[in-house]
Amino acid sequence: MQDQRNLLVFSGNANKPLAQSICKELGVRMGKALVTRFSDGEVQVEIEESVRRQEVFVIQPTCAPSAENLMELLVLIDALKRASAASVTAVIPYFGYSRQDRRMRSSRVPITAKVAAKMICAMEADRVLTVDLHADQIQGFFDVPIDNVYASPLLLADIWRAYGTDNLIVVSPDVGGVVRARAVAKRLDDADLAIIDKRRPRANVATVMNIIGDVQGKTCVLVDDLVDTAGTLCAAAAALKQRGALKVVAYITHPVLSGPAVDNINNSQLDELVVTDTIPLSAAARTCPKIRQLSVAELLAETIHRIAFGESVSSLYVD
């Protein structure tokens, strides 16, 4: 094992268990920092050990409450830079605000993915590490190097182990996810591919209209980058079962699971939802028998190690 003494890992409050698991994989202790609130609710941060000339990694997904977690990340980066860290890498397992990545037609709306990226760069973070960005082009919003790594090796290994490839078909829940679904299907012995054509009348409401592909008597594996209210997912499962699917499972990286998501999943025809721990599960989600969680700790720890010691990251992760 290479000398790790110049590598320090700090964490905000958004996902402490993941940060601790990453530290365990790296064989380093968690950096000492106070991350709390003043009496008026403002973020209070104090770095409680020397970071001078150290390679520092800050682990903080910007999941709900998104504004608070983003602010924690920004203040942590600022505190570390002012404490003379040699470099600070923002490790953002789930990059919040990423779904607002463009203006639709003539809508008078912000591009909040760009806003969040600019804020992180303004704090002079030296690098960003994230997992499965909602859209690859978000990388262009950052003015610093960014490594967007993929959870697909972890998910693929679990699909092989749990379901194999016999009688299996990979399903994209919408037209926009076809590239991701095709990549997964290719690595599952060129499994068949189906596409769900959905029409969304308004945000977080989806209506499944048509299925392109033959799912009769097959195990359907839905793949996507995130699940929010699970409305689309549950409607897709119902449509697939209606078309004769034997089993419907979903492999999704980021378990946002807001609002009625857990109830929707419990009451759906979905057989299993497999997610990662880029976002911590709520108490309700942890007790849901249909939800199973895999850990990205080993993937992120290996990536952090490679960044810290100047090794290739792209050779490790395959889209």
Swiss-Prot record:
The active site is at 198. It is found in: Cytoplasm. GO terms for molecular function: ATP binding; kinase activity; magnesium ion binding; ribose phosphate diphosphokinase activity. InterPro entries: PRib_PP_synth_CS (IPR000842), Pribosyltran_N (IPR029099), PRibTrfase_dom (IPR000836), PRTase-like (IPR029057), Rib-P_diPkinase (IPR005946), Rib-P_diPkinase_bac (IPR037515). GO terms for biological process: 5-phosphoribose 1-diphosphate biosynthetic process; purine nucleotide biosynthetic process; ribonucleoside monophosphate biosynthetic process. Its cofactor is Mg(2+). GO terms for cellular component: cytoplasm; ribose phosphate diphosphokinase complex. D-ribose 5-phosphate binds at residues 200, 224, 228-232. Mg(2+) 2 binds at residue 174. Pfam families: Pribosyl_synth, Pribosyltran_N. Homohexamer. PANTHER family: RIBOSE-PHOSPHATE DIPHOSPHOKINASE FAMILY MEMBER, RIBOSE-PHOSPHATE PYROPHOSPHOKINASE 1, CHLOROPLASTIC. This is Ribose-phosphate pyrophosphokinase. The gene is prs.
